[in-house]
A protein has these predicted regions:
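C-terminal basic regulatory modules in eukaryotic proteins
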Residues: 2-7, 16, 52-76
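A short, structured beta-strand/loop element
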Residues: 24-49
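Aromatic side chains
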Residues: 11, 21, 41-43, 56, ...
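N-terminal acidic leader/helix
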Residues: 4-31
Length: 76
């Protein structure tokens, strides 16, 4: 399998909320790293993860994540 084919099979996101949601939904995490202050989470099965990422945006999980961010901003 070539690098290009592998990239088409993975799903990558810098978003911690989406990454947590994908884990809860049973997606397999391949890589988790932080570089230059930016997160990177890589999962297998791009199609499944892309579908679930869209589901996340319309879910209560997303609302919960937004509320956490707002609370953190209040106490900074």
């Amino acid at each position: 399998m070539h690098d290009n084919e592998i990239k088409q099979e993975i799903f990558e996101t810098p978003d911690l909320g989406i990454a947590a949601f994908l884990l809860v939904k049973g997606c397999k995490l391949l890589v988790a790293e932080r570089s230059k202050g930016r997160y990177s989470f890589v999962f297998e099965d791009r199609t499944k993860c892309a579908t679930l990422a869209l589901e996340y945006v319309n879910s209560d999980f997303s609302k919960f994540d937004a509320a956490l961010k707002n609370l953190k901003n209040l106490i900074r």
